[in-house]
């Protein structure tokens, strides 16, 4: 069967840059799905995306659907013929509908009876007759949160559509999509190249667009070019460009013909904290800051323009003029803020609401102060510094800088605290209290910062859960999931041996009588343990491993982490699944015992060699493993317990647990109970699969 190249390009008004890549990828995925459902074989599907187009190029596309044999069952033979053997009206109607006579029908015999049947060959439809509808379906399923209408049309799409191109090799595929008839027209760059031109063959895409329209349609090609050119531009003056990937993606989505240029700003602005300048350059202007080899911000920036100019100096000058007022604002805010200390801003936090039922931000920082001190005592941090940092933690919200540039909260608090002469650990904690801000982000560096970060997160968790506002589905306005995962990461990765129950109880205590949920402590702890499960599964650790540990409900995250890693290692041992099955068997046996389970094994009641051997090993391991359990060395303990595989297998092969003799039965149940309790010191390994 001949294979073809299919092109679809949707020419639009400027598409939202932050959604461009996801739209193109979803378009490709959707078309693959539609082609598969239509039974049209295909090879690769390449996606292209620029500010004014979404395009797909399908290689090795089948020219038509494969022909199929379809069995069409008719009436049962008993109903197909009357008493004289003549076809009934039902049989004749069915045959006529299938283009045959009753005599031409075949017979299908099953164990339920005999039916008339006709095997029809259904010819596959040509791809060109299907592609228009398949593209329409793929576009209709794009994840577009907000649609637009344009002109006098009722049609909706993410942005107005101006051209639709569908080519199967060199043949134009007739279609009417989003109110536009398909044509060979492509639109080039707004200001360079040919504004409009026609394409003869799908194989010419995207090269023809680049050569005649001066548009690089390949998103990844533009991104690679911008990155390489920006790195080279920075290296030319000994600098290193801050090529933040999220910003790089956004800039890639803003241009069709990227040209990288370098500009400057006045050195006097370097007196302002670099974070504020960087926020202005990256967040507002989409510029790439440049640092020297030591990480110090340079008075330069790199930007990407969408045009090749005969006089780039004009574009450079224009961008310098645009950024200067923004940097001047930052300088003004910084100098003004320095006229007041952070501590002097504390009373004004009374005017900012944290949550209606939970009170103001001032009340929140007072709670953070107390809980941070509580945590500091337990992790060996300076209590006075932790409490001071907790009290000042939100004061920078009342500064001009943070009021204008909200993303600088925390980091500006650090700079202002340093200016005020606060201890360095306090200043650093003001910045690091929000860490980790996202998955994979850095953690607070020092113990004081850890105490404040944890106190802030537990205050939010206890408060919001305490008034019954649990996160539901995707709705999590107070970022409780992020707070829980962040707190767990701090405790495990910074090796802080804290108990969740103790921390939540303290966070609840300082709220006084504001909280109405009587089960808030249990709710928060369960919620956090649930976040643990999701986090480990993201790391590739099996759900059964985490469930085995969760069954024991250890509430010290550091201890929980050690157990998970130990069980994960144990699961890789040859003996693991056999011992897991044995534990499940033991669990089932013990579950049927009424009353209290026996624990004392009487040596004189050990009759069979197999139970004597198992009892000896269990007793020896109880003594040997006690210090390992106490030290939290669960991996070593489980590795030793793996040696029980053979004696356990032999025991179940040779010993009847539920003996007629009640004394023997009780003794054997005690032995199994002791065996199971050894494993339960770590996890319920009967849940391993």
UniProtKB/Swiss-Prot annotation:
Keyword Aminoacyl-tRNA synthetase on entry: yes
| Stored PROSITE patterns | AA_TRNA_LIGASE_II_GLYAB (PS50861)
- Spell out the coiled coil positions from the record: none
**InterPro entries for the chain:** DALR_anticod-bd (IPR008909), Gly-tRNA-synth_bsu (IPR015944), Gly-tRNA-synth_heterodimer (IPR006194)
Q: Which EC number applies?
A: 6.1.1.14
Q: What are the GO cellular component annotations?
A: cytosol
A matching Pfam family: DALR_1
Q: What class of enzyme is it?
A: ligase
Subcellular locations according to the entry: Cytoplasm
Catalytic reaction equation(s): tRNA(Gly) + glycine + ATP = glycyl-tRNA(Gly) + AMP + diphosphate
Q: Which GO terms describe its molecular function?
A: arginine-tRNA ligase activity; ATP binding; glycine-tRNA ligase activity
Protein's GO biological process:
arginyl-tRNA aminoacylation; glycyl-tRNA aminoacylation
Q: Which UniProt keywords apply?
A: Aminoacyl-tRNA synthetase, ATP-binding, Cytoplasm, Ligase, Nucleotide-binding, Protein biosynthesis
Disulfide bond entries: none
Q: Which family does it belong to?
A: Belongs to the class-II aminoacyl-tRNA synthetase family.
**Description of how the protein assembles with itself and partners:** Tetramer of two alpha and two beta subunits.
Q: What is this protein called?
A: Glycine--tRNA ligase beta subunit
Organism listed in the record: Aeromonas hydrophila subsp. hydrophila (strain ATCC 7966 / DSM 30187 / BCRC 13018 / CCUG 14551 / JCM 1027 / KCTC 2358 / NCIMB 9240 / NCTC 8049)
Which gene is transcribed and translated to give this protein?
A: glyS
């Amino acid at each position: 069967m001949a294979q073809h190249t299919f092109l679809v390009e949707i020419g639009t008004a400027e598409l939202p840059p932050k959604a461009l890549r996801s739209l193109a990828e979803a378009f490709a995925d959707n078309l693959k799905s539609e082609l598969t459902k239509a039974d049209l074989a295909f090879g690769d599907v390449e996606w292209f995306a620029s500010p004014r187009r979404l395009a797909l190029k399908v290689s090795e596309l089948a020219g038509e659907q494969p022909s199929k044999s379809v069995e069409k069952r008719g009436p049962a033979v008993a109903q197909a013929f009357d008493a004289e053997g003549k076809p009934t009206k039902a049989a004749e109607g069915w045959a006529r509908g299938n283009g045959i006579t009753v005599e031409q029908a075949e017979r299908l015999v099953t164990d339920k009876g005999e039916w008339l049947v006709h095997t029809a060959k259904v010819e596959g439809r040509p791809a060109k007759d299907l592609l228009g509808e398949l593209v329409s379906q793929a576009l209709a399923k794009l994840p577009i949160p907000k649609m637009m209408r344009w002109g006098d049309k009722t049609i909706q799409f993410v942005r107005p559509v101006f051209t639709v191109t569908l080519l199967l090799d060199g043949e134009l595929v007739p279609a009417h999509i989003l109110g536009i008839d398909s044509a060979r027209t492509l639109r080039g760059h707004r200001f360079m190249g040919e504004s409009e031109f026609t394409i003869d063959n799908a194989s010419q895409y995207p090269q023809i667009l680049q050569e005649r329209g001066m548009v690089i349609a390949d998103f990844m090609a533009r991104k690679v070019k911008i990155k390489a050119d920006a790195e080279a531009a920075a290296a030319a003056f000994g600098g290193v460009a801050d090529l933040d990937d999220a910003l790089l993606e956004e800039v890639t989505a803003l241009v069709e013909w990227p040209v990288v240029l370098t500009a400057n700003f006045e050195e006097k602005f370097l007196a302002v904290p670099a974070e504020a300048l960087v926020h202005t350059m990256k967040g507002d202007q989409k510029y790439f800051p440049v640092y020297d080899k030591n990480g110090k911000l340079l008075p330069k920036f790199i930007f990407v323009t969408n045009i090749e100019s005969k006089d780039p100096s004009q574009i450079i000058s224009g961008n310098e003029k645009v950024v200067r007022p923004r940097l001047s604002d930052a300088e003004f805010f910084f100098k003004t803020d320095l006229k007041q200390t952070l501590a002097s801003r504390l009373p004004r936090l009374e005017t900012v609401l944290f949550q209606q039922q939970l009170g103001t931000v001032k009340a929140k920082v007072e709670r953070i102060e107390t809980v941070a001190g509580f945590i500091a005592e337990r992790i060996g941090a300076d209590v006075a510094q932790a409490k001071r940092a907790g009290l000042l933690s939100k004061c920078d919200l009342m500064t001009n800088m943070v009021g204008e540039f909200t993303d600088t909260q925390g980091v500006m608090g650090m700079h202002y605290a340093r200016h005020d002469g606060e201890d360095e650990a306090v200043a650093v904690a003001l910045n690091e209290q929000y860490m980790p801000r996202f998955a994979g982000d850095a953690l607070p560096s020092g113990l004081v910062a850890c105490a404040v970060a944890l106190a802030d997160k537990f205050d939010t968790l206890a408060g919001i859960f305490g008034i019954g506002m649990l996160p539901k589905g995707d709705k999590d306005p107070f970022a409780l999931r992020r707070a829980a995962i962040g707190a767990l990461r701090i405790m495990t990765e910074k090796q802080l041996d804290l108990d969740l129950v103790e921390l939540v109880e303290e966070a609840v205590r300082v709220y006084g009588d504001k909280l109405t949920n009587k089960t808030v402590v249990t709710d928060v702890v369960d919620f956090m343990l649930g976040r643990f499960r999701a986090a480990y599964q993201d790391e590739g650790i099996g759900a059964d491993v985490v469930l085995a540990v969760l069954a024991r409900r250890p509430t010290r995250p550091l201890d929980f982490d050690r157990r998970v890693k130990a069980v994960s290692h144990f699961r890789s041992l040859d003996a693991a699944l056999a011992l897991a099955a044995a534990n499940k068997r033991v669990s089932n046996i013990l579950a049927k015992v009424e009353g209290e389970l026996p624990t004392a094994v009487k040596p004189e009641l050990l009759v069979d060699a197999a139970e004597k051997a198992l009892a000896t090993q269990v007793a020896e391991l109880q003594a040997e493993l006690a210090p390992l359990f106490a030290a939290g060395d669960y991996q070593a303990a489980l590795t030793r317990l793996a040696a029980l595989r053979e004696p356990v297998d032999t025991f179940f092969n040779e010993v009847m647990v539920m003996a007629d003799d009640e004394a023997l039965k009780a003794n054997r149940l005690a032995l199994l109970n002791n065996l199971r309790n050894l494993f339960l010191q770590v996890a319920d390994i009967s849940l391993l699969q």
